[in-house]
Amino acid sequence: MTEPSQSSPTRKDLEQERVLEREHWMDGPPHELFKEMRGKCPVHWTSEITEVPAAAGFWSVTAADDVHTVSRDWETYSSELGGVVVIDEVFPIELARAMFIGMDPPKHDRLKALFQAGFTPKRIAAHEDEIREIVVSVLDRLEGRDNCDLVTEVAQPAVSRVIGSFMGIPEEDDAAWAELMNTALAANDSDYSPEGVENIEETIQRAMTQIFDRCSTMIAARRENPTDDLTSVLVNAEVEGQKLEEHEIVMGFFLLVAAGNDSTKATYSSGMRALLEDREQLAMVRDDPSLVPGTVEEALRMFPAFAHFRRTATKDTVLGGQEIKKGEKVVMWYASSNRDETRYEDPDRFDVHRNPEHQAFGAGGRHFCLGTALARLELKILFEETLARYPDISLAGRPTFVESGFLNQLKSLPVKLTA
């Protein structure tokens, strides 16, 4: 599969281009724009964000080598100073700093270390039968059906139950948690924003209030009766001899559940779309399951679940020939760096034999994704079981995208399950 070039408005001078304009994200990331930026101005300044006029401008980092540099230099590019999303105004900084993804060392390292033992490849592999059982049970619900939506009826319930089992969330609450996460992370999409996209702050505040209320109930229960789930780990964690505060526990919970819900769902759905649009590639993977691990890596490369994460410059510095001032936002665009022509031949083509290195989990450094082993195992099982159960699966309609410059994922993927 080679993705068609996206149509775009008449190109302004690249120096005046606003990367986060809604028009660029209606059908997924603006890959043609990113290609132009990598070629002409790989570290690019956007002066303003139309939908949030009060927001400060930001630097876009689009080339893989530059993303690698920013990701590994936390002393120059801080997660804690300004948070990890580009628009400060829609997510309170005190909440961002309560997640270890929004911290700098040493606190980041100490908090993340509490979970690393539970996310090693060996520990995650021990859950393979459990995860496969979850995926099979989700597919069983489609028995007798001719059509379904792979996003809402396969990906979402499967990943919600997997992360829910790790966190101690009752299965009957999976759908409610998934809806809250979708609203909190994709409030600029009208389908997730009942208050309207012009009221993003109110939408996020409403979702976060419900998240705090629900999570506080779980926290109280585990203080009363500790369990062996990750929520209990957060409740009983100590960093520098101090228990985590309530909002830190809630935001740690939020981070793990949000990542568990969105990352695998996004990459599986887009990976399946790529296979469905290239029947030759689909047939190769269906007929030779040994190609599934490479398919997983190629899907991660082409379709990273999160389009960007942000850092803030701690001092004046130079990157890609551009002078960056202390306090300015620096945005790493994984949706661009994973298609960098200097690293990948024909980067817009989905190739199950490529088995690439990529930056879908970050580009190394302190914030490399904690859940890589879990995501890879979930994706492997989802691809295996879907193609084994439905060898003749095909597209049944036009996929739709979440309208977001942060989440890189499909909102719907209608398919015909049988020939």
Regions found by a protein language model. Name each.
Residues M1-A419:
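Cytochrome P450
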